[in-house]
From Swiss-Prot:
It holds the Pfam family Thioredoxin. Residues 1-54 form a transit peptide. Its main location: plastid. This is Thioredoxin-like protein HCF164, chloroplastic. Belongs to the thioredoxin family. The lineage of its organism: Eukaryota, Viridiplantae, Streptophyta, Embryophyta, Tracheophyta.
Length: 262
C-alpha cells in the first residue's frame, strides 16, 4: 500500500487508488494461471512533501498610509493659505498691555509737561516762599528770585533752589516774585530785571550785594547763600549772567489777590 503525504500536518496516509488497481488485476487473472507464492507485499513510500497553505495574513502595503499623509499635507497647506489671506488680530492680553503702555506714556507726558523736576515745581517754591514785605523787616539776609511759570530755565533750576532753601531757610529769606504780576512793576525796575530767572542777594539791611541771571551752576547759588548766611559783606558771584528768558516775553496779568507775592 502506497503512502502519501498530508498537505497540512505532514502525516503519512495510505494510497487507496493504488490498492484498488491491484485488486482489480488480481480478479481478472484466470484461476489456472494463478500461482500461490507466498510473497510479502512491499510498501512503496511515496515522496513526503508538505504544501504549506497560503498565509491568510498577507502583509499590507503602505499605500493607504501614504494617502493619509498626503491628505494631511494638503489640509495643512490649505489652512496655511487661508491664514495668509486673513488678517491676524492681537489677543485680549496684548490689547491690555498696549492700553497700559499708552496710559503710562500719557502720565509720563503729563509729568513732563509740568516739568516738575526732582519732584519740585515753581508752585512749590512760591508756596513756601517768605512774603517780600516780611523779608525786608525780619533782620535776615534775603534771596529774591524773579520768575515766571512759562520760564523753562526757572523750572529747571527749581530742584536745586529748593535743596539750598531747605538747608538755609532758618537763616536766609527766600522770596519768589512772579514777573507776570503787575504788583511787582516797581521791583522789576529797581533791580533792573531784563531776563529771568533773576536772583538778587540782599544783606540783612536790604542792600543788594550782587545778582545772578539765567542758568547757573548750583555751586554758584550755594556759595552766594552761604556768604549771606555767614554775614559776609559781599558774595563770591556778584555779576553772573547765563542763559535766560527775556523779561519782555512776560504775560502781564493782574492777580485777584494783591497781597499775593507770586
Amino acid at each position: 500500500m502506497a503512502v502519501v503525504a498530508s498537505r497540512c500536518t505532514g502525516l503519512l496516509l495510505p494510497d487507496l487508488g493504488a490498492s484498488l488497481a491491484g485488486f482489480r488485476r488480481r480478479r481478472s487473472t484466470p484461476a489456472s494461471s494463478l500461482s500461490f507464492r507466498p510473497r510479502r507485499a512491499r510498501r512503496r513510500l511515496g515522496s513526503l512533501s508538505c504544501i504549506a497553505p497560503p498565509d491568510s495574513a498577507e502583509p499590507q502595503t503602505d499605500e493607504p498610509a501614504a494617502k493619509d499623509d498626503s491628505t494631511e499635507d494638503k489640509a495643512e497647506a490649505s489652512s496655511a493659505s487661508q491664514d495668509a489671506g486673513n488678517p491676524t488680530f492681537p489677543n485680549k492680553d496684548l490689547s491690555r498691555r498696549i492700553a497700559l503702555a499708552s496710559t503710562i506714556g500719557a502720565v509720563g507726558l503729563f509729568a513732563y509737561q509740568r516739568l516738575d523736576f526732582g519732584g519740585v515745581s515753581l508752585k512749590d517754591l512760591a508756596a513756601n516762599a517768605t512774603p517780600y514785605e516780611e523779608a525786608l523787616s525780619n533782620g535776615k539776609p534775603t534771596v529774591v528770585e524773579f520768575y515766571a511759570d512759562w520760564c523753562e530755565v526757572c523750572r529747571e533750576l527749581a530742584p536745586d533752589v529748593y535743596k539750598v532753601e531747605q538747608q538755609y531757610k532758618d537763616r536766609v529769606n527766600f522770596v519768589m516774585l512772579n514777573v507776570d504780576n503787575t504788583k511787582w512793576e516797581q521791583e522789576l525796575d529797581e533791580f533792573g530785571v531784563e531776563g529771568i530767572p533773576h536772583f538778587a542777594f540782599l544783606d540783612k539791611e536790604g542792600n543788594e550785594e550782587g545778582n545772578v541771571v539765567g542758568r547757573l551752576p548750583k555751586q554758584y547759588f550755594l556759595d552766594n547763600v552761604v556768604a549771606l548766611a555767614s554775614g559776609e559783606p559781599t558774595v563770591p558771584h556778584a555779576r553772573v549772567v547765563g542763559q535766560f528768558s527775556s523779561a519782555e516775553s512776560r504775560k502781564v496779568h493782574q492777580v485777584a489777590d494783591p497781597r499775593s507775592h507770586g
